[in-house]
Swiss-Prot record:
Responsible for the release of ribosomes from messenger RNA at the termination of protein biosynthesis. May increase the efficiency of translation by recycling ribosomes from one round of translation to another. Gene3D superfamilies: 3.30.1360.40, Ribosome-recycling factor (1.10.132.20). Keywords: Cytoplasm, Protein biosynthesis. Belongs to the RRF family. This is Ribosome-recycling factor. GO terms for biological process: cytoplasmic translational termination. GO terms for molecular function: ribosomal large subunit binding. Its main location: cytoplasm. GO terms for cellular component: cytosol. The gene is frr.
Amino acid sequence: MLNEIFNKQKTQSEKSLEALKKDFTTLRTGKVNIHILDHITVDYYGTQTPLNQVATVLASDASTISITPWEKPLLKTIESAIAAANIGVNPNNDGESVKLFFPPMTREQREENVKQAKAMGEKAKVSIRNIRKDANDAVKKLEKDKAISEDEAKKAYDEVQKLTDTYTTKIDEGVKSKESELLKV
């Protein structure tokens, strides 16, 4: 019974950590990251399709992303989808591919991204605390139903807190790592 509670807490906490890492990919660092385009979809024969499923997306160099569609007629669609996504760059269609040129980031942009990273980390911590609350409620219910003793409940609460602390530390480390990556020129 308790192991199920702990396993559920671990699984949900891992998902929160993965969501945070995915959120971090949307933040622009000193070098381009093709994952900044992951959320962009294009109209492909009437269906909204992720950009990376209709084109080859490559980082040509530290400041350029090249998008080569598998079908030429998609060039205009890709260009307008990127423009609509408002990622801070204008797409450049050369007839073969769409190129995105990212200017060097200013100090202010870097600091703004650090703020966003910290906010993302805080959101993940709130999620971890909510998971802790659910786990503690499940332990409390077992104790109330006399399925476990008071001593077992105390140990379970300690284990739940230990797992919470572990994931909170992982989040803090992730935010600190992302912060140093963002501030590196």
